């Protein structure tokens, strides 16, 4: 056994589990395509100040959780991306995409990195899928993004999820609320834990994110943000809720929901799963109209998006029994060789089948026919193709259906035509055995 181990907070994903990942990714690609979203891929690291400006210097992510280093002699720090929205917005601005079209719908499935305490559904290297609508953040746009996220869950068969939603108002609303919240919490500062006391000075809204039951009891009677909203922000939120009602999307208004990133404004939302325990958030998002200006744009750019934790989604699906039917697809054909002297014939048949678009495996270890049949069954092959002396002489090979045990004798070309007709049309190449 090797002395080397995966780094703490990371894990290897082997082929059996990859099958579930590929299934989920396939559903994501299909559903978001129905809404007109296109995939974007950004660098895995960005300049550190991008995240400091966008996420917020007082957040736990920037303060404690980023993997940063200085690769260049000029000493400018770069960071492995802890989230995707800032990088997507940076790419959008750098490429001046708004000049080509006012609205861009982008999505991603990406690896992210945070220095968190490893636990179930929370690793230091993790995956998210998410979507960003850049150039629009109207109530209809917000409702569409939420609807698409929920449709992914529905298409995967996930049940029991709860959508929590709130409005953060505009900047002036949040400043008034921040002052009122601080005034309420300061007399209770002795009841706050160390992280909350630090947040009280820097950004008291972060305290509302606390999962500590003692802190939650303190903030239960705190002022509510909705009491500080201006009429326009309140009306806009009501319109979002109306569109969600029209789409039959159930939700719970949570006045304490603020999300963990400073760039959010107006509508914010979160989806929680009862299968995840105390850390129950499976995904969330909201509006972030001011992010573009923070990153150098001359004006705000309407924007709304979300992100979903892939590992947390997998845990939820596993606990709901939704992954049992997902098994690795085996080869269409497994070639069973009678003896090593016939290997060249078997290799030729294998090449022809593969070049005809038929997934084919064969023994490369010199095992007995019995062992080869066990391997064919272990790999969940559909058919076994027998290559023996009599088959080579007659050019009629035994093709056994491993599901029904039915067996026919066919030439390779006949075999290709039969197998291809049940999958997709392919050209039968010339050359090799007939």
From Swiss-Prot:
PROSITE patterns reported in the protein's UniProt record: AA_TRNA_LIGASE_II (PS50862)
InterPro entries: aa-tRNA-synth_II (IPR006195), aa-tRNA-synth_II/BPL/LPL (IPR045864), Anticodon-bd (IPR004154), Anticodon-bd_dom_sf (IPR036621), His-tRNA-ligase (IPR015807), HisRS-like_core (IPR041715), HisRS/HisZ (IPR004516), HisRS_anticodon (IPR033656)
GO molecular function annotations of the record: ATP binding; histidine-tRNA ligase activity
Keyword entries, A-Z: Aminoacyl-tRNA synthetase, ATP-binding, Cytoplasm, Ligase, Nucleotide-binding, Protein biosynthesis
The protein's Enzyme Commission number: 6.1.1.21
Self-association and partners: Homodimer.
Matching HAMAP family: His_tRNA_synth
SUPFAM superfamilies: Class II aaRS ABD-related, Class II aaRS and biotin synthetases
GO cellular component: cytoplasm
Top-level taxonomic group: Bacteria
Species this chain originates from: Chlorobium phaeobacteroides (strain BS1)
Entry annotated with the keyword Aminoacyl-tRNA synthetase: yes
Residues annotated as signal peptide: none
Protein name: Histidine--tRNA ligase
Catalysis: reaction(s): tRNA(His) + L-histidine + ATP = L-histidyl-tRNA(His) + AMP + diphosphate + H(+)
GO BP terms: histidyl-tRNA aminoacylation
Family note: Belongs to the class-II aminoacyl-tRNA synthetase family.
Subcellular location: Cytoplasm
Gene field: hisS
């Amino acid at each position: 056994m090797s002395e080397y181990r995966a780094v703490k907070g990371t894990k290897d994903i082997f082929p059996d589990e990859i099958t579930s990942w590929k299934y989920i990714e396939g559903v994501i690609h299909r559903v978001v395509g129905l809404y007109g979203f296109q995939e974007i891929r950004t660098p895995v690291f960005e300049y550190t100040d991008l995240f400091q400006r966008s996420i917020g210097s007082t957040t736990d992510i920037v303060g404690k959780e980023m993997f940063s280093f200085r690769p260049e002699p000029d000493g400018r720090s770069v960071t492995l991306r802890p989230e995707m929205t800032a990088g997507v917005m940076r790419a959008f601005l750098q490429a001046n995409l708004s000049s080509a079209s006012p609205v861009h719908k982008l999505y991603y499935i990406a690896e992210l990195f945070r220095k968190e305490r490893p636990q179930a559904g929370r690793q230091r290297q993790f995956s998210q899928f998410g979507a960003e609508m850049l150039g629009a953040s109207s109530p209809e746009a917000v409702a569409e993004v939420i609807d698409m996220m929920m449709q992914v869950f529905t298409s995967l068969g996930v049940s029991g999820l709860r959508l929590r939603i709130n409005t953060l108002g505009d900047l002036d609303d949040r400043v008034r609320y921040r002052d009122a919240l601080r005034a309420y919490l300061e007399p209770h500062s002795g009841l706050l834990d160390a992280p909350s006391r630090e947040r009280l000075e820097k950004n008291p809204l972060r305290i509302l994110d606390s999962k500590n039951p003692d802190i939650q009891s303190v903030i239960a009677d705190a002022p509510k943000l909705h009491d500080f909203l201006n009429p326009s922000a309140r009306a806009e939120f009501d319109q979002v809720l109306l569109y969600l009602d029209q789409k039959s999307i159930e939700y719970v208004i949570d006045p304490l929901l603020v999300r963990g990133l400073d760039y959010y404004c107006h509508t914010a939302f979160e989806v929680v799963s009862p299968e995840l325990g105390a850390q129950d958030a499976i995904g969330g998002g909201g509006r972030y109209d001011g992010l573009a200006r923070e990153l150098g744009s001359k004006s705000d750019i309407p924007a709304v998006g979300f992100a979903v934790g892939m590992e947390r989604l997998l845990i939820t699906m596993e606990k709901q029994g939704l992954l049992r039917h997902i098994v690795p697809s085996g080869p269409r054909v497994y070639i069973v060789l009678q003896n090593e002297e016939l290997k060249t014939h078997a290799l030729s048949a294998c090449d022809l089948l593969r070049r005809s678009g038929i997934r084919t495996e064969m023994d490369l270890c010199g095992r007995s026919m019995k062992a080869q049949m066990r391997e064919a069954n272990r790999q969940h092959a559909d058919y076994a193709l027998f290559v023996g002396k009599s088959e080579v002489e007659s050019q009629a090979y035994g093709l056994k259906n491993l599901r029904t045990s039915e067996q026919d004798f066919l030439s390779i070309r006949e075999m290709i035509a039969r197998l291809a007709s049940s999958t997709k049309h392919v050209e039968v190449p010339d050359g090799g055995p007939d």
